[in-house]
Amino acid sequence: MIDPKLLRNNIEVVNAALAKRGVQLDVQEWASLETRRKDLQSKTEKLQAERNAGAKQVGQIKKSGGDASEIMARMQAIGDEIKAAEVALSELQNEIEQKALSIPNLPDESVPAGKDENDNVEISKWGTPRQFDFEIKDHTDLGEWMGGLEFETATKLTGSRFSVLKGPLARLQRALTQFMLDTHTLKNGYTEAYVPYLVNADSLRGTGQLPKFEEDLFKLQGEKEYYLIPTAEVPVTNFVRDEIIDADRLPLKYAAHTPCFRSEAGSYGRDTRGLIRQHQFDKVEMVQIVKPETSMQALEELTAHAEGILQALGLPYRKILLCGGDMGFGATKTYDLEVWVPSQNTYREISSCSNMGDFQARRMKARYRMDQKKTELVHTLNGSGLAVGRTLLAVMENYQRKDGSIEIPEVLRPYMGGATFID
């Protein structure tokens, strides 16, 4: 959630920033809400002052032995008015908060304006796409030929957009996961975390999925309001919800491997073949909790950590700075990493690394203590390090051989019992 003070006092500044996203707030509506809020608050304060003055007057009259019944009756009436005004003010503040929860984060000054992915800016490329001297297969054909990737079985078990991995491909996915976790924890300084795959609504509100994006989530039916996590970002970032952290503990850096569950609402007909877009997929997520003045530097570091995985695997990729219109709801700045997919002759997203500023922290009431008295909102960051299924398909396609076997990247061989290829 953006700073309510900005909405109250600088709505034009908010709109100027949101213009990069192609979003504009109704200035008159917000001005009207603020006028009503101020009027109700002023009315409540005046009534409270009148009641306090009346209470003193009643005390003085009783002390002198006089009759205070008329004033006491008035005080009772004022009390009823105060209750009504407080209810009205509370309802209005709730209305304002609900509207504010649906406003996306303000883009950083360095973020380009734009509508969609066509307006994103390529920052750099790494690696050269391999030139094959044979007709290549996509990962679906490779996996089915090997007998280790089954979509029909998954459809029988659950439905479309699910998959089953078996044998060497299952082991290769496990190897990728272990390699990512080992790199982030042993080399990059993250603390490994395993978390619940079910979260409550408060957690999803804290990171920004609720209330605006409920249709993208899987919600359990039952007495308790539980949701399957769309990303480990949700439970891990909420570690600091309602917490005040000592400044010397920052930054906090966590890496978590979880399955992720997404309804993919609005993506009907897109990427229906293969592992690109699944309802359930594994991901290693990086989360950082930092001081505000270091968050942009932390974004560069976190993105470099994701790039390091791709470089170690020898997978060509490019780094993209997202424009305002293509950024996620809670981000103030985002880099996407897109890996080369030979069968599609293009780059596809494999990691998204975002600085959320204090957007999530304000929702979560997550602060750090600067001194004995003063506290300030932390900044939160998250990024994929990496999406495991998409990394698997990238390895399969980029390392395929003419006979249909797949060479194992050198850094993964210790996790594969020393094997150099699978078939």
Swiss-Prot record:
A single Gene Ontology CC term: cytoplasm
GO BP of this protein: selenocysteine biosynthetic process; seryl-tRNA aminoacylation
GO function term, MF aspect, one: ATP binding
Broad class of enzyme this protein falls into: ligase
Disulfide topology: none
Subunit description: Homodimer. The tRNA molecule binds across the dimer.
Name used for this protein in its record: Serine--tRNA ligase
Organism of provenance: Acinetobacter baumannii (strain ACICU)
